[in-house]
């Protein structure tokens, strides 16, 4: 089926041309079936089960673009932020010229959240858990959405990610607006059960566009079964006599690379990726990759950079989560170009990477947490995990005849078992996982999102889930489910996250924060307890980070720590010394450890290590020094910083519900942003630009030269900024980014010398009188009164417009219809509020929510549903009030 024939389905010519450039003139068979037989461009739900690289991703893309061009809002859901970034950049690059606005949202990409809440997008690429949080904060968002595409749908069976995805799909399924669902999944057993639950048509296609030889290499012979034809065959490889798993991997990679073929090797551990790359680089006779090494030399000095430099001398590299963003991008780019001949990667990154290749070599083992024994150990991978990795081989356009997926072993018995299991065996059945999640977390989520408000409604929603219909309803009596649900509700009520009023369950402010931030009930209870005890204390980053690290959510953030390191480093002694130095040693989180004689527990040592490491990170201690001090690599430090950034933001919201002054939330916001970028407070605004290659060292170089704001860079011009940075690649990306921002919002650049805040109403009144219009919004700061369209907005507790959001709204009112930068907004709040110190630049998403929510409460439902566009937040630029306003001071 030719792409051009899609014109019959009302696909416009500009989109058809984009598709032709992206995938060629012809659709693949599974794509043609989706359109002709399964109504891809219709209204029905659809699930596509097909192998990796079979073309199912483009099925989702076609449905998505057709819906977006039909003026429907679309969510594209992915499991990982790395995959979200990759898909966002791809879609933005591909469809910007067609007029589609593509945005992205994950825990550490929050700048588009306001636009999503306001419906100011066409396609939003969102991580599973983040959409769940967005729907809690803005449940009406579902009313605007016409299509939800779920990539990697098979993760509904994953014990870690499955519960969040299943609950999200349950909400979508039960929503009144009934958005259409298109699911994309690797092949699983009994797929009809999932299709039946989602009321979806089921397209199962097991063919691949390029033949794949799936088999096992043992003692120099690669026995395989062809995926499409089922034909059995064998190939001879060099037998170098290896017996250990690692040596067998290296031998296979060396043989294939020696033939001039590219190889991707999946191993079970991050350390193994580095070790194997170093060993093979030392013994393989492959050319030096000079261009990549030159690029690498311009990046920040890290241990990973040195290891990569060593392996790239033989066109070999490694890829794992310990690399920085810049290092990962470099490796991926040079591997896609074919210059890197052998790449060693962790199996956990198989899903997030789009690195197609002719040959994939697979270790065959994975690290698995055995709950029964409370420990980690090596286990065989599942069939679906194998398919996900092997599917990277033999991708269309990269392998003309066939690809290879190669498991390695020196045991002929093991080879026969694996060949049968992975090349011809049955797929695992779909097993629901919602029962694995704490039931109290599900209760809070459903209450906060408005999907349930009583015991019976909670039970009905849970029984409507995939787990409910396929497991609970069949294996658990009503009394058993009621007992479990009663316990979960009791935990929520006793923890202050829900109340009972006249037979109904109501979410509290604390419960709302718990659900919207996704931190879990157990973590919220512990953080709320700290917040109540500490609300009169000055904020200490060391204390906050230690408390966060000791919470359940903080403990779940992985950092390696050996027994030897635990004993030798004595992180308890280090953190008590730092606490004494910071004059916070008397605070409970530290004081309780002063008199301890026994060695610190593993959990305590791990929490102390994370807190100390993150304190060094935000104080701009050199990254190589941090690596040496805490025995971690730069990528891991950044990853932990990003994960804690989200947790600290949640702590700020929890603290306000526990009695902290609203104005103090900005202290948590500032700390959260510093954790994201690893900088001191004066570099935060430039860090928000998120320019790839503009790391901590270069940001500090700009700050030392007097630049802390984007406007200052624009005022001095490119020549001066280039001279200061002295880094060609980073400068070009930086200047391109801020130039685009200036083009998008020219009225805000260059920055005014002083923020102009209207302190009297006359100029606005004159403008309104001239146009014959009356103000929709009236703000009287002296009388502490706010009216919108004649409806009084509460300015006193409860559920009121608090002081800082009120002042910010007043600043926006003084520039009604104009864009106000976040810096100008902070300065305006200080001026109107007669503050001695200018507050930290606000979190625009949070501020917008706190301005809009009290206004919505004051309005009838029909008016409240239509004011999401009243206050606009523009990424990287500022905020704008979209109505006529009158301000009296």
Residue ranges and their predicted role:
Residues 155-211:
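Post-DEXD/H (motif II) to motif III coupling segment of the RecA-like Helicase ATP-binding lobe
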Residues 75-76, 85-88, 92-103, 264-344, ...:
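Conserved C-terminal RecA-like helicase domain
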Residues 184, 191-197, 201-275, 317:
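Conserved interdomain linker/interface between the two RecA-like ATPase lobes of SF2 helicase motors
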Residues 379-419:
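Conserved segment of the helicase C-terminal RecA-like domain
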């Amino acid at each position: 089926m030719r792409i051009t024939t899609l014109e019959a389905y009302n696909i416009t010519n500009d989109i058809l041309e984009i598709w032709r450039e992206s995938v060629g003139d012809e659709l693949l068979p599974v794509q043609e079936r989706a359109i002709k037989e399964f109504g891809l461009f219709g209204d029905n739900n659809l699930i596509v089960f097909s192998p990796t690289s079979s073309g199912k991703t483009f099925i989702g893309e076609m449905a998505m673009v057709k819906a977006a061009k039909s003026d429907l809002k679309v969510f594209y859901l992915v499991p990982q932020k790395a995959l979200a970034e990759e898909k966002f950049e791809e879609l933005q690059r591909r469809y910007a010229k067609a007029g589609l606005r593509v945005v992205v949202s994950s825990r550490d990409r929050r700048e588009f959240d306001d636009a999503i809440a306001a419906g100011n997008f066409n396609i939003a690429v969102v991580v599973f858990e983040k959409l769940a949080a967005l729907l809690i904060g803005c449940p009406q968002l579902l009313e605007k959405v016409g299509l939800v595409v779920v990539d990697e749908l098979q993760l509904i069976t994953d014990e870690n990610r499955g519960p969040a995805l299943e609950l999200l799909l349950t909400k979508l399924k039960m929503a009144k607006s009934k958005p259409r669902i298109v699911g994309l999944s690797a092949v699983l057993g009994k797929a009809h059960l999932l299709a039946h639950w989602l009321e979806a048509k089921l397209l199962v296609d097991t063919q691949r566009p390029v033949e794949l030889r799936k088999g096992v290499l043992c003692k120099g012979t690669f026995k395989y079964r062809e995926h499409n034809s089922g034909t059995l065959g064998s190939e001879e490889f060099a037998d170098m006599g290896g017996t250990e798993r690692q040596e067998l991997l290296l031998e296979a990679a060396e043989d294939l690379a020696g033939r001039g073929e590219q190889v991707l090797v999946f191993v079970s551990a991050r350390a193994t990726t580095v070790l194997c790359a170093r060993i093979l680089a030392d013994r393989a006779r492959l050319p030096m990759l000079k261009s990549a090494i030159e690029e690498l030399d311009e990046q920040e000095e890290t241990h990973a950079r040195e290891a990569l430099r060593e392996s790239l001398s033989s066109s070999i590299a490694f890829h794992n989560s310990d690399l920085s963003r810049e290092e990962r991008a470099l490796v991926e780019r040079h591997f896609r170009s074919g210059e890197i001949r052998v790449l060693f990667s962790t199996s956990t990154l198989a899903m997030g990477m789009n690195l197609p290749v002719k040959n994939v070599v697979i270790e065959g083992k994975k690290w698995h947490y055995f709950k029964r024994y409370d420990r980690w150990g090596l286990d065989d991978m599942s069939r679906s995990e194998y398919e996900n990795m092997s599917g990277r081989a033999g991708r269309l356009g990269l392998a003309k005849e066939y690809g290879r997926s190669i498991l390695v072993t020196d045991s002929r018995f093991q080879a026969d078992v694996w060949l049968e299991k992975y090349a011809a065996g049955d797929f695992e059945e779909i097993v629901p996982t919602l029962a694995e999640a704490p039931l109290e977390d599900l209760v809070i989520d459903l209450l906060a999102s408005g999907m349930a408000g009583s015991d019976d409604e909670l039970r009905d929603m849970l029984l409507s889930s995939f787990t409910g219909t396929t497991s609970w309803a069949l294996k658990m009596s009503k009394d058993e489910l009621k007992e479990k649900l009663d316990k979960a509700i009791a935990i929520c009520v006793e923890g202050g996250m829900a109340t009972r009023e006249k037979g109904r369950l109501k979410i509290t402010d604390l419960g709302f924060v718990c659900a919207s931030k996704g931190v879990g009930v157990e973590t919220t209870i512990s953080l709320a307890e700290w917040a109540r005890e500490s609300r009169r204390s000055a904020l200490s980053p060391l204390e906050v980070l230690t408390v966060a690290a000791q919470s359940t959510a903080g403990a779940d953030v992985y950092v390696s720590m050996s027994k030897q390191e635990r004993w030798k480093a004595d992180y308890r002694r280090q953190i008590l010394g730092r606490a004494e130095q910071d004059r916070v040693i008397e605070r409970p989180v530290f004081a309780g450890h002063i008199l301890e004689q026994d060695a610190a527990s593993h959990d305590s040592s791990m929490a102390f290590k994370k807190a100390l490491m993150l304190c060094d990170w935000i104080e701009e201690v050199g990254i190589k020094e941090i690596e040496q001090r805490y025995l971690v690599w730069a990528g891991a430090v950044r990853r932990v910083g990003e994960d804690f950034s989200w947790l600290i933001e949640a702590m700020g919201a929890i603290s306000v519900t526990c009695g902290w002054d609203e104005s103090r939330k900005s202290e948590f916001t500032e700390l959260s942003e510093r954790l994201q970028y690893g900088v001191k407070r004066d570099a935060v605004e430039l860090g928000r630009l998120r320019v790839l290659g503009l790391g901590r060292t270069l940001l500090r170089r700009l700050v030392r030269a007097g630049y802390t704001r984007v406007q200052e860079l624009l005022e001095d011009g490119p020549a001066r900024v280039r001279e200061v940075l002295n880094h060609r690649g980073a400068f070009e990306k930086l200047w391109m980014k801020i130039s685009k921002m200036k083009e998008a919002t020219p009225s805000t650049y260059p920055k005014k010398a002083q923020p102009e805040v209207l302190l009297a109403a006359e100029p606005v009144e004159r403008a309104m009188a001239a146009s014959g219009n009356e103000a929709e919004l009236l703000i009287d700061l002296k009388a502490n009164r706010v009216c919108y369209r004649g409806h009084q907005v509460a300015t006193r507790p409860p559920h009121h417009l608090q002081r800082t959001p009120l002042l910010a709204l007043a600043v926006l009112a003084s520039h009604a219809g104009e864009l106000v930068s976040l810096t100008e907004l902070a300065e305006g709040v200080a001026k109107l509020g007669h503050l001695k110190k200018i507050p930290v630049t606000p979190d625009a998403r949070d501020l917008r929510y706190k301005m809009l929510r009290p206004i919505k409460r004051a309005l009838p439902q029909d008016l409240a549903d239509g004011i999401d566009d009243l206050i606009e937040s523009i990424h990287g630029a500022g905020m704008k009030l979209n109505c006529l306003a009158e301000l009296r001071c």
